Swiss-Prot record:
InterPro entries: Capsule_synth_CapA, CW_Biosynth-Accessory, Metallo-depent_PP-like. The keyword Membrane applies. One of its GO terms (cellular component) is plasma membrane. It comes from Bacillus anthracis. Belongs to the CapA family. The chain crosses the membrane at residues 25-44. It is a single-pass membrane protein. Induction: Capsule synthesis is transcriptionally regulated by AtxA, AcpA and AcpB. Essential for the synthesis of the polyglutamate capsule of B.anthracis which is one of the principal virulence factors during anthrax infection. May form a polyglutamyl synthetase complex together with proteins CapB and CapC. Keywords: Capsule biogenesis/degradation, Cell membrane, Membrane, Plasmid, Transmembrane, Transmembrane helix, Virulence. This is Capsule biosynthesis protein CapA. Residues 386-411 are annotated as: Disordered. The keyword Transmembrane helix applies. It is found in: Cell membrane.
Amino acid sequence: MRRKLTFQEKLLIFIKKTKKKNPRYVAIVLPLIAVILIAATWVQRTEAVAPVKHRENEKLTMTMVGDIMMGRHVKEIVNRYGTDYVFRHVSPYLKNSDYVSGNFEHPVLLEDKKNYQKADKNIHLSAKEETVKAVKEAGFTVLNLANNHMTDYGAKGTKDTIKAFKEADLDYVGAGENFKDVKNIVYQNVNGVRVATLGFTDAFVAGAIATKEQPGSLSMNPDVLLKQISKAKDPKKGNADLVVVNTHWGEEYDNKPSPRQEALAKAMVDAGADIIVGHHPHVLQSFDVYKQGIIFYSLGNFVFDQGWTRTKDSALVQYHLRDNGTAILDVVPLNIQEGSPKPVTSALDKNRVYRQLTKDTSKGALWSKKDDKLEIKLNHKHVIEKMKKREKQEHQDKQEKENQVSVETTT
């Protein structure tokens, strides 16, 4: 795939061509062009981003995005400008969140590529160890590793990825060194709310799924999928107040969720999922609401180098939970430019993203266009009620334990 040239690169090519024909002309205009190049770069680096507004009585703010791929042409941009450059337009959203998740669409390689056994497939993605530290510094708190590229460089690549995440102290879901490890659920206390995060993939090649002895990803086998979600919500097991499920599913470049996606989504909500975040198609798919569970079938790419218009359309979701249990989700339309996600300003582009996000949405869903985003309203009182009930039980358990210690001490 040929990368689109930047304004600066086009100018440099123009200079080279003109220099051969008219060196004297170049000597005159070269200083002026140098000023233009510097100014253009400065504008790109310092372009203002709208501040993120917090609502009153917010309990927590969570941000969720789609596929993150920091290799190939994105790596060239990072090498030139730094990682901050890639996230510069969305940094306020990431930094002003209590929880940030996305799909990490490649393994981390700690050695030269020749030391790895490539998977039998056409496209192989990879990233360097510093990428994990970079996404953590950008604001991500947990990432999904269950996807069709995690085993691109074999078992060794998957193990290196897990090692890199552990060394960076960044939580991950959906991949592990064996079947027991891959079923790990991440529990995080987010402003008093116990949030469980899970990750599964329905897109994989032979040998990519974790077994008793082999590292890999966690598949969307319905038996395992639904048991894991129920476990996360069960008061006697995970006891989570809010359950977020990452799903790598659907068909690539298909902007409509498949019947399988729709059936699995409803089954997941019935099992206890509150938020389902889909990725893999590389294009946007509509969201839907089922029994107050929110389903984003595909948020498309987030950081990627694909050049097709539909693969450059993206969205960022911010989940705001209020103290009274009202959940408001802001869906911010984005467009990917030079690998970097940027909030859309053109009315035409906004409407294209809005249309794609809502064309298959059920009629009963409560949503509206507000300011520069879609706003979705949900009744998530059950999350607050579960949190209060859990806190009360934890307090009672603590008191009983302290009383028991006191009795043992006095006797």
